[in-house]
Amino acid sequence: MSMPKEKIKMVFICVENARRSQMAQGFAEVFGKGEVEVFSAGSRPSSQIDPLVIEVMKEKGIDLSGKRPKGLNDLPPVEMDYLITMGCEETCPAVLSKKIIEWDIPDPKGKPIDVFREVRDLIEDRVTTLLKEMRSQK
């Protein structure tokens, strides 16, 4: 009997964990189902996910309504394979990770829904590319 393959652990980090990192986690959980264990967190977590994020992700068939922003202390104390920052605007947190990737993605906070859609589509594209690269390195 072969041992089950260990899932790749990835964490997406932004400031509030209310917009960008939540969208990235949502896409990674759907597109990497069964292959990756996905986390997200914020260096200064907000009290709730931005309602526009919930709305634009629902347009893609991904329901984030039950999720809530988490802080770095909420992450499990394990080494991550990938740490993806969304442009933290500050030094990014010390989370133990084998590989750190910086995505400079603008925060759509306070912008119209069309900007949220643009950011969502950019994140979807980045997550898809990351998962392809990850699979090719297996």
Give residue ranges: language-model regions.
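Conserved active-site segments centered on acidic
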Residues: 2-73
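Short, well-ordered turn and helix-capping elements at secondary-structure junctions
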Residues: 42, 87-88
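Alpha-helix C-terminal capping/helix-to-coil transition sites in glycosyltransferase folds
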Residues: 77-79
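Phosphate-binding/catalytic loops
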Residues: 88-138
